[in-house]
């Protein structure tokens, strides 16, 4: 089992990153909450990982903290929730927000995540109640300290596509974003507008 990777971040394309560890590049899928916390390309980074072994592939999922990884592991134990949907959930809300939504039985908030219908949201509440703790340290950073360039706007669109939205929805959600929006703030605002629909 690969539990942690420490190396140099050499690629970033939401939701996947590549971490070079002693000359070996590991492809790792990460939730957007982790993606925003990653350093610039070429900088050292550490990810807590979960290795999923399938018949046709070995897949690595990375997280900024052990707590976020544990939340992911709890999510994939829920009937009908696979790794892709678990990443979408952790991309749409922090582990703390998920714990609060489950504890308060906020079906509307949970079913706003792409791929989660009302029945699945109810199952999440039923199967996760009492199993998720809020740690207070799993929040999305306020944003990057620079304005969104066209590349950053495409990062916002890519993030929405990775969360299960189609290109039309992603384009509509990013069309009205302010020109000076940061990537993390842009995704947050886009998700907020998509969840109102």
UniProtKB/Swiss-Prot annotation:
SMART domains: HhH1
Annotated segments matching region Flexible linker: 143-147
Compartments (UniProt record): Cytoplasm
Main location (coarse class): cytoplasm
One GO BP: DNA repair
Written domain comment of the UniProt record: Has three domains with a flexible linker between the domains II and III and assumes an 'L' shape. Domain III is highly mobile and contacts RuvB.
Free-text function comment from the UniProt entry: The RuvA-RuvB-RuvC complex processes Holliday junction (HJ) DNA during genetic recombination and DNA repair, while the RuvA-RuvB complex plays an important role in the rescue of blocked DNA replication forks via replication fork reversal (RFR). RuvA specifically binds to HJ cruciform DNA, conferring on it an open structure. The RuvB hexamer acts as an ATP-dependent pump, pulling dsDNA into and through the RuvAB complex. HJ branch migration allows RuvC to scan DNA until it finds its consensus sequence, where it cleaves and resolves the cruciform DNA.
Name of this chain's protein: Holliday junction branch migration complex subunit RuvA
Native source species: Chromobacterium violaceum (strain ATCC 12472 / DSM 30191 / JCM 1249 / CCUG 213 / NBRC 12614 / NCIMB 9131 / NCTC 9757 / MK)
């Amino acid at each position: 089992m690969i539990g942690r990777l420490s190396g140099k971040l050499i690629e970033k394309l939401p939701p996947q990153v590549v971490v070079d560890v002693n000359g070996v590049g590991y492809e790792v899928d990460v939730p957007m909450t982790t993606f925003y916390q990653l350093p610039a390309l070429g900088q050292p980074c550490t990810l807590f990982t979960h290795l999923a072994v399938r018949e046709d592939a070995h897949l690595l999922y990375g997280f900024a903290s052990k707590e976020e990884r544990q939340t992911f592991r709890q999510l994939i134990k829920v009937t009908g929730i696979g790794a892709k949907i678990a990443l979408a959930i952790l991309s749409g809300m922090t582990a703390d927000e998920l714990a609060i939504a489950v504890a308060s039985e906020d079906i509307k908030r949970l079913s706003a995540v792409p791929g989660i219908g009302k029945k699945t949201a109810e199952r999440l509440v039923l199967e996760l109640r009492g199993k998720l703790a809020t740690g207070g340290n799993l929040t999305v950073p306020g944003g990057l300290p620079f304005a969104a360039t066209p590349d950053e706007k495409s990062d916002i669109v890519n993030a929405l596509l990775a969360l299960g939205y189609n290109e039309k929805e992603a384009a509509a959600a990013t069309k009205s974003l302010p020109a000076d929006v940061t990537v993390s703030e842009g995704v947050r605002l886009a998700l907020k507008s998509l969840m109102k629909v």
